Structures are given as structure tokens and as C-alpha cells.
From Swiss-Prot:
Family note: Belongs to the transketolase family. DXPS subfamily.
Keyword vocabulary terms for this entry: Isoprene biosynthesis, Magnesium, Metal-binding, Thiamine biosynthesis, Thiamine pyrophosphate, Transferase
Catalysis performed (reactions): D-glyceraldehyde 3-phosphate + pyruvate + H(+) = 1-deoxy-D-xylulose 5-phosphate + CO2
Listed name of the protein: 1-deoxy-D-xylulose-5-phosphate synthase
Cofactor: binding details: Binds 1 Mg(2+) ion per subunit.
Organism name: Sphingopyxis alaskensis (strain DSM 13593 / LMG 18877 / RB2256) (Sphingomonas alaskensis)
Gene3D superfamilies: 3.40.50.920, 3.40.50.970
Superkingdom of the organism of origin: Bacteria
Enzyme category, top tier: transferase
The enzyme's E.C. designation: 2.2.1.7
Pfam families the record matches: DXP_synthase_N (PF13292), Transket_pyr (PF02779), Transketolase_C (PF02780)
Gene field: dxs
Length: 642
């Protein structure tokens, strides 16, 4: 454990009201202490470091100038919210970040009044802030709404949809564009800072508004000419023509690490009668911590690390990660199939598409944070005879559900969905859990839905998807490493809608989908030890179901239990529907379904999350015993928790 940093000024600040008592000349030291505290905390817990380091000064300035929590501060995504949490009454718990029972790694309404809106998916902040601004306006209540959004999040259409509707909020809405990738503006200097102060000042804004009103009274040709002249003049100097076209007063670019620039500009905007305003702040991800600044990913997401050296704790060697198995398998298949194309929405390394891109760069597409586009782009490719793989996290595929339905399923186009992070995901908690994809995909006509039980099955399913041209097909797999089984040298094409019997028994049957198979086998061992002959079925497909295998299994066993890493409405519901429709439970069969509970589970270690969800071997055993009307108290006597 690292020593805590010396933070005399930070120690005096528990909430932003305390920060506002500091003198302006003390803010530089305060920001340095805040940065040191954040580095120390994340070194202990792991988490998203680089983003937070890049907004230390911006966070300080916003809370210093604005009256939070009356003024609503909405962070986009939330990766950068750690400094915000430290100075909003949560410093005493900051070393519980992303731990079970600890602070969320994102903003969370139930956690603090300083988190007015929860976030973890991108590009939502402007819409939410606009809602706060308009609500205050309608209720005639004081308060501004400030949205802080990164340049990466601006690649999603939702941000522009919000900006296109923001004009009616007037000066109650302020958008701060945190440009930490230098993708929009060049490096800023003294001239940019001077211009930003000038255009954010009340006299300049009032002069511009007078000029606008005067120009509107001119004949139409002159009015348009005056408008264009104003836009071109500011566009050449400031680079904000796009935002002005959307109805914003553009201020910037400014140095997002220079408090002497940030404070007066934020004060000018706060005191202005004109708006909405967009402030363009250029920051550096990983700022102030040399190992982060030197790293290619700027320490975006890190394990626990040594604060002095920056060296991250390394996990012990083990089986390959699922996303790497997928990426490498797809790259190998693409060597002989030129129709295979890979698409990712800003997550190349997270999905394994980076492995594919290294070998086939011309057939790899990172579309940015634009899942809707990714899916329909894949649909267009499929319609023209390509074999597109849209590799998207389960939680992010939700953002493109209409495209899945309308552009893919209805047209029966063979888009392949590689669904990463299926099931519970650990430290990222409920916002990133892949809980719903079985339910929302298996309900669609034409869709095939598979779930890999281990990394070997993932190889087979990737190949099966590549060869499936009859319509859309999806295969899901979890975050983390595989189970350690040997990878097949030659992938097999699985028969669509066919499961496999892993273990034969006579009394109990466990029908598993996905990586709960390992727990199902453990449960079978325990049940066998109690004299209950147990079958284990790896169904492989949530849709179409292996109806023949299910009928045979239900008819031959006293108790059948389905197990899946998904919400209600998934595999269990489909098996129950089949059993009910065909009268398979009329003869007294005891059929039970185990799935994720009807709640959003907070962050914890995945194995503890699944234990809480009731999807580990002991809970499977207990479900069987209760169904057989055994005394469940006897479970503990057998060394199994009831």
C-alpha cells in the first residue's frame, strides 16, 4: 500500500462550499493535491485514471465558480468523475472505488446530491443537462446546468441531437467540450486564451446580440451576408462555426489546465445573460503523472499500480481472454474468406478487433461511439454480399436495438453479432452488465442466438457465424479469461439449434446456456454424491431451441433446471413456453429456471455477483433439492450452502 500524499489544502475541503472559501492563488496548489490524492487512491483500487487526471483543473474550476449542487453538473460517461467525487464529500470512501459495497466508478444519483444524473454510457450529458435547464426555466427556479463531454463522445449522434434542441435553454445551459485527444483543435496559446476571454465577456456577447438583431432587420441578402461574415470571422479565429450553427455561443479553445484562464472564462459565462454557451477546453489525458502521459492509452483503465513507478499489478498467467480468442479466430478465418469484415464502436482492444485490424486493416472499421451506425453499416455490407461481424459489448448493443430489429432482423440480413461482456462484468457494475441480450435478441424472428460455454466453443461459434448466410446470428461470451480448455486447431461448424449432452443421468437435468456450464457440472457432482443421478446439457442455442433434446430431457427426468447468465425472458422463459405449449409439465415434471434477479446489481467481483444472483453451484443444488421436496437444511450438512 502506498503512503498517503501530503494534502493540507485538500484536507480543508469536504464539499465544494469549502473549496469556494479558498483564495484564487491557492487553487493551483489545491489542484496538485487533488491530483496526488487521486493517483494514490486509484493506485490502491485500480480504475479509470487517465480521464480523471485530465480534468483535475477543470473540476476544480467548475466547483469553484458554480454553485453546486444547485447548479447541476453532469459528467458524460463518468470515467473522469474521481476528482469530482473526492471534493463532493466522498474522499473518505474514495479507496473503495469499484469495490463491492464501495463507491461506483461512475456518477450515481443514489450516491450523492452532487451527482444529479448517473452516467456510464457516452453522449448522454447534453440531453440530461438540457432537461435540468428547461425544468428550472419552466419552474422559474435558479440554477444552471453544466454538461462536461469529451471529444470522443461527440462522435455519437445523440450529442448533436441534444445540441440541435438546446437553444431554448438560453443561458441556463453550458456545455464544456473536454477535448483530450487534440482531435478538434490545435494546441492553444496566449492568443486563443485572450480571444476566449474576450468572446465570453458580457460586453462582447451583448454587442454580438445587438448586431444579430440589427442584421435580422436588413434585407434578406444582406442579412445572410452579415451572418456568414460573422461566422467566418469567428470560425477562422476560433474554430467554432459548427457549434454556432447549432445555436451555441462558442468560447475557446482554451487551456483546460490553466486555472488563470479557466476561472475568469467560467465566471464570464456564469454571469452572462446569453446562451447556451459551449466552452472548448483542451486537456491532456493522464496530465501530471509521467507514467500515464507516456503510456499509449494514457492509463485509461488500470489495475492496481505502484504510484512511484507506475508499474501495474500483473494478473497471474492463465487462459487467453475471450475477446482475444474471438479476434484471433476471426483474423485467421479472414485469411481465406475475403468477405469477412470486422466492425467495432470505439472498442477495438476491448472486443479483440485490434487483433483483426493488425492483419486486415482494410477490412476493419472503428466507427467511433456510434453503435446505431455500426449495426446499419453492417447491414449494408451484408446486403452487398460481405460477411460483417459487429463486435459490440452487450450493454452497448442496447443503444442500437431499433437498428437490430428494423435494419437487420426484418430484412433477414446475415449480420454477425459478436457480443462481448455478456453477463455480469464485475467492477463496472450495473451500467455495463450484459444482462439483457438473450431476452431482447431471442424474441426477434429470424435471429439465431448462441452462447459459448468456454473458449473452445467460442472458436466454433465464430466459425459457425461466419458460415451462416441464412440470416442474422449472434454469439455471446463473457468478460475475462477462458476456462483453460484446449483451443481447437480446426473449428467446427455447429448445427444450428442443436445442443449437446455433456453428462448423462436419470433423475435431475441441468440445462445450461453459456459459461454457467462449469457451475452446472460442479452442482452435478454434489447431487451425484447425494445419490441423485444428474444430466448436464449444454444447450448452446437460446434460439432456435433444440426442441428435440429438450423434449427428450424433460420426459426422462424428475427435475429439470435451466441456468443462464441473463435476465428473465431469456432461455428459461423459452423452455417454459415450449413445455407449456406441448403439455410437457402436465405429468408432474418439476421445471425450474435460474437467471439473473430482477434488479440492477452493483459492482463486485464477478464470482460474488453470481453468488448473490443465485447462479453458482450451491444455489443450483438447493433449487434441485427444494424441487424434490428434500429438506433444504440438509444442504449445509453436505457442505453446500443453502
Amino acid at each position: 500500500m502506498t503512503d498517503r500524499p501530503h494534502t493540507p489544502l485538500l484536507d480543508t475541503v469536504d464539499v465544494p462550499a469549502d473549496l469556494r472559501k479558498l483564495k484564487p492563488e491557492d487553487l493551483r496548489q489545491f489542484a496538485d493535491e487533488l491530483r496526488a490524492e487521486m493517483i494514490s487512491a486509484v493506485g490502491t483500487t485500480g480504475g479509470h485514471l487517465g480521464s480523471g487526471l485530465g480534468v483535475v483543473e477543470l473540476t476544480t474550476a467548475i466547483h469553484y465558480v458554480f454553485d453546486t449542487p444547485r447548479d447541476k453538473l453532469v459528467w458524460d460517461v463518468g470515467h473522469q468523475c474521481y476528482p469530482h467525487k473526492i471534493i463532493t464529500g466522498r474522499r473518505d470512501r474514495i479507496r473503495t472505488l469499484r469495490q463491492g459495497g464501495g463507491l461506483s466508478g461512475f456518477t450515481k444519483r443514489s450516491e450523492s446530491e452532487y451527482d444529479p444524473f448517473g452516467a456510464a454510457h457516452s453522449s448522454t450529458s447534453i440531453s440530461a443537462a438540457l432537461g435540468f435547464a428547461i425544468a428550472n426555466k419552466l419552474k422559474d427556479e435558479p440554477g444552471r446546468a453544466i454538461a462536461v463531454i469529451g471529444d470522443g463522445s461527440m462522435s455519437a449522434g445523440m450529442a448533436y441531437e441534444a445540441m440541435n434542441n438546446a437553444k431554448q435553454a438560453g443561458n441556463r445551459l453550458i456545455v464544456i467540450l473536454n477535448d483530450n485527444d487534440m482531435s478538434i483543435a490545435p494546441p492553444v496559446g496566449g492568443l486563443s486564451a485572450y480571444l476566449a476571454k474576450l468572446v465570453s465577456s458580457r460586453p462582447f456577447l451583448e454587442l454580438r446580440e445587438i448586431a444579430r438583431r440589427f442584421a435580422r432587420k436588413l434585407p434578406e441578402p444582406l442579412h445572410k451576408a452579415a451572418k456568414k461574415t460573422d461566422e467566418y470571422a469567428r470560425g477562422m479565429a476560433m474554430g467554432g462555426t459548427l457549434f454556432e450553427e447549432l445555436g451555441f455561443y462558442y468560447v475557446g479553445p482554451i487551456d483546460g489546465h490553466n486555472l488563470d484562464h479557466l476561472i475568469p472564462i467560467l465566471e464570464n459565462v456564469r454571469d452572462s445573460d446569453h446562451g447556451p454557451v459551449l466552452i472548448h477546453a483542451v486537456t491532456k489525458k493522464g496530465k501530471g503523472y509521467a507514467p500515464a502521459e507516456a503510456a499509449a492509452d494514457k492509463y485509461h483503465g488500470v489495475q492496481k499500480f505502484d504510484v512511484i513507478t507506475g508499474e501495474q499489478a500483473k494478473a497471474p498467467p492463465g487462459p487467453p481472454a475471450y475477446q482475444n480468442v474471438f479476434g484471433e479466430t476471426l483474423a485467421k478465418l479472414a485469411e481465406t474468406d475475403k468477405r469477412i469484415v470486422a466492425i467495432t464502436a470505439a472498442m477495438p482492444s476491448g472486443t479483440g478487433v485490434d487483433k483483426f485490424a493488425k492483419v486486415h486493416p482494410d477490412r476493419s472499421f472503428d466507427v467511433g461511439i456510434a453503435e446505431q451506425h455500426a449495426v446499419t453499416f453492417a447491414a449494408g455490407l451484408a446486403a452487398q454480399g460481405m460477411r460483417p461481424f459487429a463486435a459490440i459489448y452487450s450493454t452497448f448493443l442496447q443503444r442500437a436495438y431499433d437498428q437490430v430489429v428494423h435494419d437487420v432482423a426484418i430484412q433477414n440480413l446475415p449480420v454477425r453479432f459478436a457480443i462481448d461482456r455478456a453477463g455480469l462484468v464485475g467492477a463496472d457494475g450495473s451500467t455495463h452488465a450484459g444482462s439483457f441480450d438473450i431476452t431482447y435478441l431471442a424474441t426477434l424472428p429470424n435471429m439465431v442466438v448462441m452462447a459459448a460455454a468456454d473458449e473452445a466453443e467460442l472458436v466454433h461459434m465464430t466459425y459457425t457465424a461466419a458460415e451462416h448466410d441464412a440470416g442474422p446470428i449472434a454469439f455471446r461470451y463473457p468478460r475475462g479469461n477462458g476456462t483453460g480448455v484446449a483451443l481447437p486447431a480446426v473449428p467446427q461448424k455447429l448445427e444450428i439449434g442443436k445442443g449437446r449432452v455433456v453428462r448423462e443421468g436419470k433423475t435431475v437435468a441441468i440445462l445450461s446456456l453459456g459459461t454457467r456450464l462449469a457451475e452446472a457440472l460442479k452442482a452435478a457432482d454434489t447431487l451425484e454424491a447425494r445419490g441423485l443421478s444428474t444430466s448436464v446439457i449444454d444447450l448452446r442455442f437460446a434460439k432456435p431451441l433444440d426442441e428435440e433434446l429438450i423434449r427428450r430431457t424433460l420426459a426422462a427426468h424428475e427435475v429439470c433446471v435451466t441456468v443462464e447468465e441473463g435476465s428473465i425472458g431469456g432461455l428459461g422463459a423459452h423452455v417454459l413456453t415450449l413445455a407449456s405449449d406441448e403439455g410437457l409439465i402436465d405429468a408432474g415434471l418439476k421445471l425450474r429456471t435460474l437467471r439473473l434477479p430482477d434488479m440492477f446489481q452493483d459492482q463486485d467481483k464477478p464470482e460474488l455477483q453470481y453468488d448473490a444472483a443465485g447462479l453458482n453451484a450451491p444455489q443450483i443444488v438447493d433449487t434441485v433439492l427444494k424441487a424434490l421436496r428434500h429438506n433444504s437444511a440438509g444442504v449445509e450438512e453436505a457442505g453446500v450452502r443453502a
